[in-house]
Amino acid sequence: MSHPLPPNIQEILQLLPHRYPFLLVDRVIEFNAGKYIKAYKNVSINEPFFQGHFPGFPVMPGVLILEAMAQSGGITVLQSFPINELQGKVFLFAGIENVKFRQQVIPGDQLILECEIIRHKLQLWKMSCQAFVNNKLVAEAILTAAMTNKENF
């Protein structure tokens, strides 16, 4: 199913089960459903994780950068299905490869998330993902995700 416009926040909330404080995609900038997405997360000092990571030296945890990339990739995969086909389904991490963190992400940054689907077989998707701040690469990874029935979860 082709979607000519990037999903708005209401559509993102329909696609992803995540909610505050764990929804890590604020807006989709560009996308081609099932192929590519560019989105962003505005990183605010009000994020709950900054209370403990780290007091006096707030740094976004790397695992949350990975999660933001995964949520972005999930949006592009899930947008390729009619919404009624997603009932009873869940989209999960299945693997992470070649993770590199290159720079810290701090309050005030806008984290740009880019994911490209590089392989799809049956219910598995492999994505090449990068995160940028001010056009500088801050993290990259190859992510694998799987779609399964919620009752199998």
Curated annotation (Swiss-Prot):
The keyword Lyase applies. One of its GO terms (molecular function) is (3R)-hydroxyacyl-[acyl-carrier-protein] dehydratase activity. It holds the Pfam family FabA. Its EC number is 4.2.1.59. It comes from the Bacteria. GO terms for cellular component: cytoplasm; membrane. GO terms for biological process: fatty acid biosynthetic process; lipid A biosynthetic process. The active site is at H53. It is found in: Cytoplasm. The keyword Lipid metabolism applies. It catalyses: a (3R)-hydroxyacyl-[ACP] = a (2E)-enoyl-[ACP] + H2O. Keywords: Cytoplasm, Lipid A biosynthesis, Lipid biosynthesis, Lipid metabolism, Lyase. InterPro entries: FabA_FabZ, FabZ, HotDog_dom_sf. PANTHER family: 3-HYDROXYACYL-[ACYL-CARRIER-PROTEIN] DEHYDRATASE. NCBIfam families: fabZ (TIGR01750), PRK00006.1 (NF000582). Belongs to the thioester dehydratase family. FabZ subfamily. Involved in unsaturated fatty acids biosynthesis. Catalyzes the dehydration of short chain beta-hydroxyacyl-ACPs and long chain saturated and unsaturated beta-hydroxyacyl-ACPs. This is 3-hydroxyacyl-[acyl-carrier-protein] dehydratase FabZ. The gene is fabZ.
